[in-house]
Each structure stands twice: as C-alpha cells, then as structure tokens.
C-alpha cells in the first residue's frame, strides 16, 4: 500500500505547478474549517437558542458578548508543549494553540436576560426575544 508521498511521486501529474496550488488551497481551507465554531441556531416565537461546539476549551477561557445585535463567541485553548508527565516528554504536538471566534447577527433581544451554560464541550446561549422592539420589514421608496 502506497503512502501519500509515494502516491504523489508516482503520479505523472504531480510534477505540474498546478498541483502545488491545489495542495495549498486544500490545506489552507482545511485549516480554516478546523478553527470555525460549529453551531446550531434555533428560533422560536420567544427566543433564539445557539448551541456551539467548543471541545477541549475550558469554561474559563470562553467569552460570550452581545452588543448592537451581534452575539460574539470566542475561546482559546493552549497546551504547554514543554510538559513532561507520566507519559514522557512531549516530542510532537499538533494541539498547541486553538483560538476561535465567531459572530452571529441576532437582533431584537432582551440583552439583560441572555443566559449561557457550558457542558460536555457544548456552549448553549439562550437569547430571549424582545417583542416590544419594532421590526420594520419594508421601507417605502420615494
């Protein structure tokens, strides 16, 4: 069974410059996707519920802010690469730093009633809707 390098070297098309750009594009977008917070947003008549995956990030390192109709979720996890523990000295790590941030436009919210909880790597933010705020759906053209 050929490994990835052997397959690439045996492929005649691997010598083209376009393959370099394809690999670059694939790696770039895979890296970007890995730092994107995966989210489900539910809407009812009374509230929005945002459930965001933040696995491995301690609760203390997660920030939730709401300002001007925008919910911002961010978090950071850092692993010290110089640690030596019962498993031995760490000689290779791909998990040294993770920093994520995402924003969501959720307007007409009762800002003082927003609640957040974190369990098993899932952040849940409940944003009650403010029914007193007027929502304008159409603007007349003069």
Curated annotation (Swiss-Prot):
InterPro entries: A-crystallin/Hsp20_dom, HSP20-like_chaperone, Small_HSP. Pfam families: HSP20 (PF00011). Residues 27-142 form the sHSP domain. Keywords: Cytoplasm, Plasmid, Stress response. It is found in: Cytoplasm. It comes from the Bacteria. Gene3D superfamilies: 2.60.40.790. Coiled coil: none annotated. Its main location: cytoplasm. PANTHER family: HEAT-SHOCK PROTEIN 20 FAMILY MEMBER. Belongs to the small heat shock protein (HSP20) family. This is Heat shock protein HSP.16.4. The lineage of its organism: Bacteria, Bacillati, Bacillota, Bacilli, Lactobacillales.
């Amino acid at each position: 069974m050929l490994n990835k390098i052997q397959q690439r070297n045996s492929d005649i098309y691997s010598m083209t410059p376009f393959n370099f750009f394809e690999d670059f594009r694939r790696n770039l977008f895979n890296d970007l996707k890995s730092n994107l917070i995966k989210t489900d947003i539910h809407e009812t008549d009374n509230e929005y519920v945002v459930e965001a995956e933040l696995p491995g990030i301690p609760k203390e390192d997660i920030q939730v802010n709401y300002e001007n109709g925008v919910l911002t979720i961010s978090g950071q996890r850092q692993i010290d690469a110089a640690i030596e523990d019962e498993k031995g000295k760490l000689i290779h790590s791909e998990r040294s730093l993770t920093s994520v941030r995402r924003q969501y436009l959720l307007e007409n919210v009762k800002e003082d009633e927003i609640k957040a909880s974190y369990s098993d790597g899932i952040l849940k933010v409940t944003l009650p809707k403010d029914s007193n705020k007027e929502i304008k759906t159409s603007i007349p053209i003069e």
